[in-house]
Amino acid sequence: MDLGKVITAMVTPIHPEKDKVCKKRIHHLVNHLIENGSDGLVIAGTTGESPTLSHDEKIKLFRQVIETNDGRAKLIAGTGSNNTAETIAFTKEVAELGGIDAVLIVAPYYNKPNQDGLYAHFAAVAEASDLPVVIYNIPGRSVVNIEPETIIRLAALPNIVGVKESSGNLDNISKIIAETSDDFQVYSGDDSLTLPILAVGGNGVISVASHVVGNEMQEMIQAFERGEVQKAAQIHRELLPLMNGLFSVPNPAPTKYLLNQQGISVGPVRLPLVDLNAEQGTKLQAILEGLSK
């Protein structure tokens, strides 16, 4: 299964007055992303503020994205949690919606399982799931790192098709790529590491920056794949200040700020996250405007 090169970890549009997942804004955002470089979308992931979405809100979100997408982009639903049984049940429920291509399963957070526990968790979900599974390794948030040896073992299971690697450890990522099959897809979970991970054999990126520079992210990857490494490196350097700026305060507040400024209304972030203040917003806007100079 080819999930694409640029997969956007989509923000969740929230109505600013009603504090509800907003159907109209979802429709607008999905079309914007697909028309501007996104091969696929991750729905209800970290950038989608999944911890503050209820079960019913996630289902509503999935349904609306499926309807708007109409088969154009690959859809990956975030169905993971730190409860294996709950993850399995929710993944099965999402599979019944139709229109979802794969699920993203985050490393269990807070519980701090060891490597045997991590393997057993992902193996149980993969065995029970009708949808292909993408592992999500993000030790900065989940506290535990899925070691490359564990990911390599999991990659041998028939229903585990890839990993979103947000560890930032290129040595580990290189080992995963070297010791898994060619059809196991390794995605950068950090925009700034997209090009380095491509250079060691990765497939693409699950991106935040692609909300606002999706075409440029595509151009960078395509240039690299054509062998135009210097051009790809130049694009990387040009985009790097924005990639870093989007994490100047906790994600996805900066991304939502820029989208709202561009007329793509996605509303605020939910507490305990807070929106950018005026000074933060001005600095971020200046970074974006600097890209075109």
From Swiss-Prot:
EC number(s) from the headed UniProt entry: 4.3.3.7
Pfam family, any one: DHDPS
Catalytic site positions: 136, 164
Alphabetical list of PROSITE patterns matching this protein: DHDPS_1 (PS00665), DHDPS_2 (PS00666)
Gene Ontology molecular function, alphabetical: 4-hydroxy-tetrahydrodipicolinate synthase activity
Compartments in which it is found: Cytoplasm
Residues under site feature: Part of a proton relay during catalysis: 46, 110
Name of the top EC class for this enzyme: lyase
NCBIfam families for the chain: dapA (TIGR00674)
Self-association and partners: Homotetramer; dimer of dimers.
HAMAP family for the chain: DapA (MF_00418)
Similarity remark: Belongs to the DapA family.
Protein name: 4-hydroxy-tetrahydrodipicolinate synthase
